[in-house]
């Protein structure tokens, strides 16, 4: 907290006015902001998965985000500082995953209405699989620096969806 006070030139009383529960509350606020940035960095593509070209633009935005970020994941650092199993950290992570999942599922459903994807596909399962692939690819990238796993997860996931059309 002393580092934050020094960088923001705020007093301890100001800091505790906005974050009365202290460090964890402050870190959760920053984690919520970082989680929002994960989705914002994918817009407008994530919110407009209406064609195969749009899916490719979204894929490229996801890969670009993690290429720029590299092995320094602000959200992962914050969560490790807070503790991944605390109720606050789980709420931030759950909200991020739910919003991300819902955006992908909406894109799948849109493609179904255009008869570009089989109507019988479960859009929620497809979204869950794509999101799990992204998370796995990001995990490998954070551990090794290799972005290829993320690219493969997205490419194979989108291509599989496309072949269901």
Question: What is the predicted function of each stretch?
Answer:
Residues 27, 54, 67-88:
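Amphipathic alpha-helical segments used for helix-helix packing
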Residues 31-38:
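Short, basic, alpha-helical segments at the C-terminal edge of helix-turn-helix-like DNA-binding modules
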Residues 40-71, 123-130:
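Hydrophobic alpha-helical connector segments
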Residues 60, 94, 98-101, 105, ...:
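Conserved terminal C-lobe alpha helix of the protein kinase catalytic domain
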Residues 65-68, 110, 130-148, 160-165:
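Amphipathic C-terminal alpha-helical segment
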Residues 85-87, 98-126, 161-165:
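Hydrophobic alpha-helical bundle segments that form small-molecule/ligand-binding pockets
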């Amino acid at each position: 907290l002393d580092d934050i006070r020094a960088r923001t030139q705020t007093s301890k009383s100001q800091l505790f006015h906005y974050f009365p529960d202290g460090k964890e509350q402050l870190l959760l606020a920053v984690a919520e902001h970082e989680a929002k940035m994960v989705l914002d960095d994918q817009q407008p593509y994530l919110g407009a998965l209406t064609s195969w070209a749009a899916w490719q633009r979204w894929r490229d935005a996801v890969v670009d985000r993690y290429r720029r970020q590299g092995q320094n994941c602000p959200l992962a650092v914050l969560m490790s500082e807070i503790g991944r199993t605390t109720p606050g950290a789980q709420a931030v992570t759950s909200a991020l995953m739910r919003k991300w999942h819902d955006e992908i599922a909406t894109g799948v459903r849109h493609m179904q209405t255009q008869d570009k994807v089989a109507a019988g596909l479960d859009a929620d399962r497809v979204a869950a699989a794509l999101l799990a692939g992204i998370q796995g690819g990001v995990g490998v990238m954070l551990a090794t620096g290799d972005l290829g796993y993320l690219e493969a997860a997205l490419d194979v996931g989108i291509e599989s969806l496309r072949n269901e059309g």
